[in-house]
């Protein structure tokens, strides 16, 4: 892992080929915040070999593998549920996942008409090498972002599954909790799931107005105006100077326009 400030200003001469950068003599055509990606070489360098009996001892062995189109890595036991992985190893595995995610995004935003299919193939390969139930993603927000990539590639249910998994975690921030509800409400229009999520948060943190506001929004979008009005009236009983709540109550309590 190389921090941007440790690249000594040679970003435009770096090329990602797997888990390492290669320093090249060729400058990138476009200046970006990240070094360019050698897609084909990277695919080979992070894919598991299909022949465990063919070992790489010498440089020519490596090039024979490359020229034959074979994968290089041997991800031994990283999908074995009987092996214990401590927190440090779990964090290191995120570096492996990062390479797969870069390739997935490259496909997703490319002009290739099969880009989404290729993205799903790469993500499924990643899940096969490092199953989520064996080596969990240590960062809850990264877990959600992986789900969002699945959704963009055509598998929205994978995002929902990951949201449900993240909701069970004890280490997620309140900002992430808020974000989860917004995804249910705005991306899936699953107002029942959003309401259930925000009701739990509001019960646990009744003093945080943002959870009240988002729960009111979810009630309103689900056409449960009476619940939204009741919640606002209850809140204003102890927070009479909350101008935003007053404004929302005046709107939601007014008769519907025919």
Regions from the language model: what does each represent?
Residues 101-102, 136-145, 174-179, 209-217, ...:
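Alpha-solenoid helical repeat scaffolds
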Residues 221-258:
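Terminal, low-structured helical/coil segments at or just beyond the last alpha-helical repeat
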Residues 110, 153, 187-188, 222, ...:
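Structural motif corresponding to the intra-repeat A-B loop/turn of tetratricopeptide repeats
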